[in-house]
Amino acid sequence: MAPFARFSLTCLAALLLAGTAQAGTQTLPIKQTVDVLPAEQYQQHLQQLRQQVRLAVTFAQAERARPAGRASVSLQPMFSAQAGSWPFEPFVNNGLFRAIAGYQAHHPQVVTLRGGSITLAQLHDALNDSRILKRYKDGYLLSYPLMIGADAGLVLEGTSLYLSSYSGTALINQGWLGLNKSNLESMAGDKAGNTDRAWRPFVIAWAGSHTQVVGSTLKRLGYNANLSRGLTTAISTQQPASSRPATVVIRDSQFSEMSSAVELQRSQATIEGSRFEQSQQYAIDVRDSQVSVRDNQLRGIDNNSGVRLRGQTRALVENNLILGAGKAAIEVSEQQGAVLLAGNRIGDSRGNGIQLRSLAPTPAAPLVIDNNLLGSSVGSAIDASEVGALALLGNHITNTPEYAVSLRNATPMAGPLLLSGNRLGQVGKAILRVEGMRQVELGGNSFDGKPLLQNLLIGDLLPLQGTLLESTVRQGNTVRVSQR
């Protein structure tokens, strides 16, 4: 008999009879048919689906060597609405210029790098001005905004760079920024800033740039304003639409006390083996990008989700530990492109474990949630609405007060919803709620419920509960439920 450890045959029979009785007393809003699928062919289909989605989200991360030669260093005025001002134009009204005005006694200036690469020690010697860059603790304290030109690079190697909050400091990258075994953090000091909001230094990397953070630490950067939340990538309206995406490589690093640790727009990014702690908004926020997020730990997101995927995004989110998100551990909303969420361990979310909203996956760009462990969320483990297709394969869901899986579409969608090989149970309500999905395929799942006290299947599947349990549990079949 297929796995169904917590249900005796007597209890199962009671559920079957209950399902039959309920079906007999309800008027079915739609006609539903149940077909048994050939087991071997179905397993081949699942294997092909896994291979297809893995291929769709896999990419070769673009790496870039730092620019050759020694960069030139200059101080340039920050005139808004002028030629060449677009890299800092978005920050005219966000507090940066007010913070600068409280420190610089003249028209705001930015340190500009051109035509090569430079280390912090070399930059210190070239500037020779402690008001701009001075030795501090185990590295240097920067008190001016710094702009890395498209042909330039800033190298942090085994050092620390402190960014002054009081003076209005930011790193604006059009070229190449690299941290290796280094520390980048804000320094507030004991002086109040000249701003009307909680302002902190940030890093912005524009389309065409490359940023890499390896074995390094970023701390206390960003505040909740556009393009200023931490380490952010974006494309400016002043850049050609054909500009190549910003590239980001983050490995074996730590991010803590950020507004949003990493906010990616129009990017290609690899984030591996890193820790994200005490983020205010999101740990990783992705839009219109290609991203691989693997083997990371995300702990303590105050207000929103751990990982958010939106827009034209292809994403692999795999083998991550995500604990204590303010909303969902992983949120996918209004997104197009293949997504694979695999092998993640998710718990203690103050919303849903995984939240899916307004998605229309296709056979070429599927949405697959595979082999994840989800538990102890305040809402449902997986909560989906207005989702056109979804595959849930081999997941273990337990200890949630709502539903193990809830999918609701106001307007019926074609599907399919695939549920195969999942272990689902110890939930407060029904294990599976499905509304508005024209095709549902079930098989090989095990259920840990409360016999006689709760339904396993509700929504559109409630009238068929007895039939489906008989076929999939007692007989071990995989079935397709079709609505007409």
Where is each model-derived feature located?
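Bacterial N-terminal signal peptides that target proteins for export
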Residues: 1-9
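Bacterial N-terminal signal peptides
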Residues: 8-18
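Beta-strand/loop edge motif enriched in small/polar residues
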Residues: 23-384, 392, 401-407, 414-419, ...
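Acidic, aromatic-lined catalytic clefts of primarily extracellular/periplasmic carbohydrate-active enzymes
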Residues: 388
